[in-house]
């Protein structure tokens, strides 16, 4: 659709140029109509918070997830302007456990602390919500490992 609209704009510009050439096109009123037709690309459906959470939980709960997909998913998730919900982090930690990747599990907890930024109440809340999972999976927090003092 975008390619077709761009071709139409190029053809229209070439026909407006006429005998004066492309360097000195004849001004024609109304070129914004052609441009506006290609600027409708941001009108997609918007994802609710619940759908967002469900999408990421499903992603990390894939039984055949590999280490690269885990890192890619976490990298993408960290790129968003939010602190992931505890249920998303829970699914990511369980994926780490399935892969026997303790380092990634600790790194995920470090990233959550970093994403919380100056809001000091967020990270303790997330750890409190994840405590049963951390105990079940045998994952230590960065503070328990002494990494917060480095």
Swiss-Prot record:
Which Gene Ontology terms of cellular component type are present? mitochondrial inner membrane; respiratory chain complex IV
What is the primary gene name for this protein? Answer: COX5A
The organism encoding this protein is Otolemur crassicaudatus (Brown greater galago)
**Origin, by domain of life?**
Eukaryota
**Sequence positions bearing N6-acetyllysine:** 87, 113
Q: Which cysteines are joined by disulfide bonds?
A: none
Q: What does this protein do?
A: Component of the cytochrome c oxidase, the last enzyme in the mitochondrial electron transport chain which drives oxidative phosphorylation. The respiratory chain contains 3 multisubunit complexes succinate dehydrogenase (complex II, CII), ubiquinol-cytochrome c oxidoreductase (cytochrome b-c1 complex, complex III, CIII) and cytochrome c oxidase (complex IV, CIV), that cooperate to transfer electrons derived from NADH and succinate to molecular oxygen, creating an electrochemical gradient over the inner membrane that drives transmembrane transport and the ATP synthase.
Q: How does it assemble?
A: Component of the cytochrome c oxidase (complex IV, CIV), a multisubunit enzyme composed of 14 subunits. The complex is composed of a catalytic core of 3 subunits MT-CO1, MT-CO2 and MT-CO3, encoded in the mitochondrial DNA, and 11 supernumerary subunits COX4I, COX5A, COX5B, COX6A, COX6B, COX6C, COX7A, COX7B, COX7C, COX8 and NDUFA4, which are encoded in the nuclear genome.
Specify the protein name. Answer: Cytochrome c oxidase subunit 5A, mitochondrial
- What is its pathway? Energy metabolism; oxidative phosphorylation
């Amino acid at each position: 659709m975008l390619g077709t609209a761009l071709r139409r704009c190029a053809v229209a510009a070439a026909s407006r140029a006429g005998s004066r050439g492309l360097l000195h096109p004849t001004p024609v009123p109304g070129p914004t109509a052609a441009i506006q037709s290609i600027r409708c690309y941001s009108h997609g459906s918007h994802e609710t918070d619940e759908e967002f959470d469900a999408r990421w939980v499903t992603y990390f709960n894939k039984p055949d997830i590999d280490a690269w997909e885990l890192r890619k998913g976490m990298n993408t998730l960290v790129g968003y302007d939010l602190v992931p919900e505890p249920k998303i982090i829970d699914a990511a930690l369980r994926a780490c456990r399935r892969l026997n990747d303790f380092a990634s599990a600790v790194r995920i907890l470090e990233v959550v602390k970093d994403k919380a930024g100056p809001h000091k109440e967020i990270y303790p809340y997330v750890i409190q919500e994840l405590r049963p999972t951390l105990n079940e999976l045998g994952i230590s927090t960065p503070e328990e490992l002494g990494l917060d003092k480095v």
